[in-house]
A protein has these predicted regions:
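Short beta-strand segments
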Residues: 12-13, 124-126, 152-153, 179, ...
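Short coil/turn connectors at secondary-structure junctions
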Residues: 5-7, 53-54, 82-83, 118-120, ...
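Conserved core of the sugar-phosphate nucleotidyltransferase
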Residues: 133-220, 232-233
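Proline-centered turn/helix-capping motifs that create local helix->coil transitions or kinks
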Residues: 74-83, 171-179, 184-188, 278-285
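Left-handed beta-helix
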Residues: 1-8, 13, 196-209, 223-375
């Protein structure tokens, strides 16, 4: 899948990640380990690459060293390609001496870098979501509709609508209104998706489980439109820019029916990860047509000695001895010693193996070794 049109992706990842603390204590949110061997940022980047979009910027601000290392070691395109994955960290210049004030402000302050690519379309993606999407299909619809902005939209139930931004559209799929996180007792029936548009887009009937549309925080802008709507002091896409654009310009909804989850909280992070270890997970990492890419670590296969392991994922480079593990995920280079019992555990893994000398030093200091000790 190759894009004939010049499209460029921008992954937003510069927030403090306070809802994911302490996982974001020393690293940016997109660099948080996920599913044992991946990083959160691998999801949007992989979706772009699988869709033929090879010019990708990652916007960061906090604790970006780990993210820089991951990107540099993972996404290296060949010499004869014009593709790249490049990190743009917040910077102070002669024109501005403030950090990113929000998602829109982050994009605005980097427009000078984007201009070099002469893109026709800007694709805005989040760095903390799990989904698999052919972005080329969304781009094709955006161009065909003649819209200035297209918003990826997930059909949901009324119960789910409370925590999301809700979109109202007409029978042609053009967005007419937007409501941010409606209360449970609020009547939002006017926001129900038209049955004809649901049928035309997804070939499905409207029911209680899909009668409303939630914004996924994934946008495709015409390049000129995005520069125009950012020519102000507004700082946030979801709260300020998008509602104003809907009122003033032609905005289309792209319906997406696949799995999609925001992983911005500890609860969502934990539950989404453990679901991956279930017999029939909602998201399938075993897709050869649209794989999720990550850093090739060149680690040996996991060694399992006298263990009872079920409904779990074990990542490469781990050594597990005489342990009971169920409904859990074991990260890379994890050492689990005899007698340990893990149920419903996400073990993040390690960046390196400790030497015998380091372990002896740990004993002297009275601190544990990396990994899980004897049970």
């Amino acid at each position: 899948m190759r894009c004939k049109e010049k499209a460029m992706a921008i992954v937003l990842g510069g927030g403090k990640g306070t809802r994911l603390y302490p996982l974001t204590m020393d690293r940016a949110k997109p660099a948080v380990p996920f599913a044992g061997k991946y990083r959160l940022v691998d999801i949007p980047i992989s979706n772009c690459i699988n869709s033929g979009i090879r010019q990708i910027y990652i916007l960061t601000q906090f604790n970006s060293a780990s993210l820089h290392n991951h990107i540099a070691n993972t996404y290296v395109f060949d010499t004869f390609s014009n593709g790249f994955v490049e990190i743009l960290a917040a910077e102070q210049t002669n024109q501005t001496d403030t950090w990113y004030q929000g998602t829109a402000d982050a994009v605005r302050k980097n427009l000078k870098h984007f201009h070099d690519q002469d893109a026709d379309y800007y694709i805005i993606l989040s760095g903390d979501q799990l989904y698999r999407m052919d972005i080329k299909d969304m781009l094709d619809q955006h161009i065909a509709s003649g819209a200035e902005l297209t918003i990826a939209s997930k059909p949901i139930s009324r119960e789910q609508a409370t925590g999301l931004g809700i979109i109202g559209c007409d029978e042609q799929g053009f967005i007419t209104k937007f409501y941010e996180k409606p209360a449970n007792d609020l009547d939002i029936s006017e926001y129900k998706v038209p049955a004809s548009y649901m049928k035309d887009s997804l070939g499905k009937e409207v029911g209680e489980n899909n009668e409303y549309l939630a914004s996924m925080g994934i946008y495709i802008f015409n390049a000129k439109t995005m520069e125009e709507v950012l020519n102000n002091n507004k700082t946030d896409f979801g709260k300020e820019i998008i509602p104003d654009v809907i009122k003033q310009r032609k905005v289309s909804a792209y319906l997406f029916e696949g799995f999609w989850e925001d992983i911005g909280t500890i609860k969502a992070f934990y539950e989404t990860n453990l679901d991956l270890a279930s017999i029939s997970p909602q998201f399938n990492f075993y897709d050869e047509q649209m794989p999720i890419y990550t850093h090739r670590r060149h680690l040996p296969a996991t060694k399992v000695n006298f263990c009872n392991i079920s409904n779990s994922l074990t990542s490469e480079g781990s050594i597990i001895t005489n342990a009971y593990i169920v409904n859990s995920i074991i990260g890379v280079r994890t050492l689990i010693e005899s007698g340990a019992s893990l149920d419903g555990v996400y073990c993040m893994g390690a960046s390196y193996y400790e030497t015998e000398e380091e372990k002896a030093e740990n004993t002297k200091k009275g601190i544990p070794n990396i990994g899980i000790g004897r049970g």
